[in-house]
Regions:
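Active-site metal-binding loops of divalent metal-dependent hydrolases
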Residues: 63-64, 100, 191
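Short glycine-/acidic-enriched loop or helix-start segments at secondary-structure transitions
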Residues: 24-26, 50, 69-71, 103-106, ...
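Catalytic nucleophile loop
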Residues: 86-110
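Pocket-forming structural segment of enzyme catalytic cores
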Residues: 107-195
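N-terminal beta1-alpha1 cap of cysteine-dependent amidohydrolase-like domains
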Residues: 1-89, 125, 205-257
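A glycine-centered loop/beta-turn motif at secondary-structure junctions
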Residues: 163, 174-218, 229, 233
Length: 257
């Protein structure tokens, strides 16, 4: 699907939210800092998916449903079609957790249930390509070392789409992050966590899993650096990629800087 208008600088980025407790967190603030208008589309509240012609970028959040749960959540199929259209139009796309699985599925990769739950504070290890990546690579975001602190909450996992670049792994789940093209990223893990999201998550986490303030602060600090780089690369056209608002009656929320 080709872009009908090559200049989308004034069009809002759509954040597709699937459940109340998995909002954009730091993603929305970083976009606002760059002057990017954001529309949060609450699919769990019955909001309609936007047209590809109306968005300047796409962020797809997590949720407890799975890629294959289309009987219970019929919008999942439409969301994948929108993701594919955004990739084909060379728009910036960020998929987080379920969103990464949806991105992988939209690009033809298999999504399956894994052997174990991966839940709670942790880290991912960057691959050789991940260490050189303009978003995740320490040379670009100022991080030290080759690991990225994050929060995990998943069991489903994805195969890598064809022609994608593998960026990060854990021992339990080697496919933690990938890039397709220069501006489409899938992150199985969460770096958007801030104090508000952590507060919403704590009572929902499995017994024995804690999310202490120190872990949240580390993830928020690192996450903002990673997200800053993602937005910078997206807005620059990714030339170097070779190495809250109020709800309206549709269920969408408009956030503007």
């Amino acid at each position: 699907v080709a872009r009908s208008d090559p200049d989308r600088s004034g069009r809002p980025w759509a954040v597709l939210q699937h459940v109340a407790h998995e909002g954009p967190g730091s993603i929305a603030r970083v976009l606002a800092e760059h002057g990017v208008p954001v529309v949060v589309v609450r699919l769990d509240l019955g909001a309609r998916l936007p047209s590809i012609d109306d968005v300047g970028g796409l962020v797809v959040m997590g949720g407890p449903m799975g890629v294959h749960d289309t009987d219970a959540f019929p919008w999942l199929a439409g969301e994948r079609a929108l993701i594919r259209a955004a990739v084909d139009a060379d728009l910036a796309v960020l998929g987080v957790c379920l969103g990464a699985q949806q991105l992988a599925a939209a690009l033809g990769a298999a999504v399956t249930t894994g052997p174990v739950d991966e839940v709670g504070p942790g880290q991912v290890e960057l691959t050789a390509d991940g260490r050189r990546d303009p978003v995740l690579g320490p040379e670009y975001n100022g991080l030290s070392g080759t690991s990225v602190p994050c929060v995990h909450w998943h069991r489903d996992t994805f195969a890598l789409p064809g022609a994608s670049t593998h960026l990060a792994a854990t021992r339990a789940y080697p496919h933690q992050a990938f890039r397709t093209g220069t501006r489409a990223y899938g992150l199985q893990f969460h770096v958007e966590i801030d104090a508000d999201l952590a507060e919403a998550w704590r009572p929902l986490l499995p017994s024995g899993i804690t999310l202490d303030d120190g872990a949240v602060a580390r993830v928020e600090d690192v996450g903002r650096r990673v997200l800053q780089r993602f937005v910078e690369v997206a807005l620059s056209g990714a030339d170097d990629a070779d190495g809250a608002g109020t709800a309206d009656d549709t269920g969408s929320t408009v956030v503007r800087s």
